[in-house]
Amino acid sequence: MFRSFSTAAKQAVKGTYVQRAIVGGAAVVGIGASTMLYADSLTADAMTAAEHGLHAPGYGWSHNGPLETFDHSSIRRGYQVYREVCAACHSLDRVAWRTMVGVSHTNAEVRAMAEEFEYDDEPDDQGNPKKRPGKLADYVPGPYPNEQAARAANQGALPPDLSLIVKARHGGPDYIFALLTGYPEEPPAGVVLPPGANYNPYFPGGSIAMGRVLFDDLVEYEDGTPATTSQMAKDVTTFLHWCSEPEHDERKRLGLKAMIVLSSLYLLSVWVKKFKWASIKSRKIVFNPPKK
């Protein structure tokens, strides 16, 4: 009896040592992982503004409010800037012509714009390829047939597609506007740029293949708006923001409707609760003891 008790005690003590060893090992691993993460965070914080790019200031965009929508006149002007300036190098592969109808242009205007381009059609009976005018269902064509042609025309640099550029960059429209208007006359002293590169403090590393493209009176707006550099940058940024979020206005409308409906249902539920429970919560129970 004594021997069996001693064996059980030894096993219990051994199990305790094993548990302590596991807990100690887990603690060591946790401390090591925390130390590595802390060291990595210090390394990330050591990145300079020149390496990461100057942080773009915040601008008061008219569509930033919870109930504000896009300035559709600005979208129309922004498309004009894209067509006359940006379309020479950048594409809008994910934007269909039909999405512009009722947003920035009329149905007839968009049809006319689409018909200015030719798209591949089904081959004829002899198997020869054919071309056809663009339709509303087509997507905005790019300036180059493939990536190799784009790089060859831009000294090896690949101009990014602008369909989702606002959502794909930290800072969104603020970054795009700051980049377009942030080219200085000369790079700062001590900055050495590769051949063919341009200096822009908002671009990571400061060296960018794209030079300044917006200058005062570069385009002539249809509505007579003065085409200053900042105005063109604002308009094309608004247009690109719409390209990234074409559902922006509709989403806010649905959100407002949902808030109204949910608020009404909440107030109705409060009234029903008070109506149903008022008599129950305010009732009094009187106990009359029997007379002897």
Curated annotation (Swiss-Prot):
Molecular function GO labels: heme binding; metal ion binding; ubiquinol-cytochrome-c reductase activity
Subunit record text: Component of the ubiquinol-cytochrome c oxidoreductase (cytochrome b-c1 complex, complex III, CIII), a multisubunit enzyme composed of 3 respiratory subunits cytochrome b, cytochrome c1 and Rieske protein, 2 core protein subunits, and additional low-molecular weight protein subunits. The complex exists as an obligatory dimer and forms supercomplexes (SCs) in the inner mitochondrial membrane with cytochrome c oxidase (complex IV, CIV).
Cofactor: heme c
Keyword Repeat: no
Signal sequence coordinates: none
Domain annotation Cytochrome c: ranges: 73-226
Primary location group: mitochondrion
Subcellular location: Mitochondrion inner membrane
Taxonomic placement: Eukaryota, Fungi, Dikarya, Ascomycota, Saccharomycotina
Residue ranges of the region described as Disordered: 117-137
Catalytic activity annotation: a quinol + 2 Fe(III)-[cytochrome c](out) = a quinone + 2 Fe(II)-[cytochrome c](out) + 2 H(+)(out)
Cellular component annotations (GO), alphabetically ordered: mitochondrial inner membrane
Residues on Mitochondrial intermembrane side: 47-253
Gene Ontology biological-process entries: mitochondrial electron transport, ubiquinol to cytochrome c
Organelle targeting sequence: 1-46
A family per Pfam: Cytochrom_C1
Similarity comment text for this entry: Belongs to the cytochrome c family.
Function in brief: Component of the ubiquinol-cytochrome c oxidoreductase, a multisubunit transmembrane complex that is part of the mitochondrial electron transport chain which drives oxidative phosphorylation.
Class of enzymatic activity (EC top level): translocase
Protein name: Cytochrome c1, heme protein, mitochondrial
InterPro entries: Cyt_c-like_dom (IPR009056), Cyt_c-like_dom_sf (IPR036909), Cyt_c1 (IPR002326), Cyt_c1_TM_anchor_C (IPR021157)
Keyword Nucleotide-binding included in the entry's annotation: no
Origin species: Kluyveromyces lactis (strain ATCC 8585 / CBS 2359 / DSM 70799 / NBRC 1267 / NRRL Y-1140 / WM37)
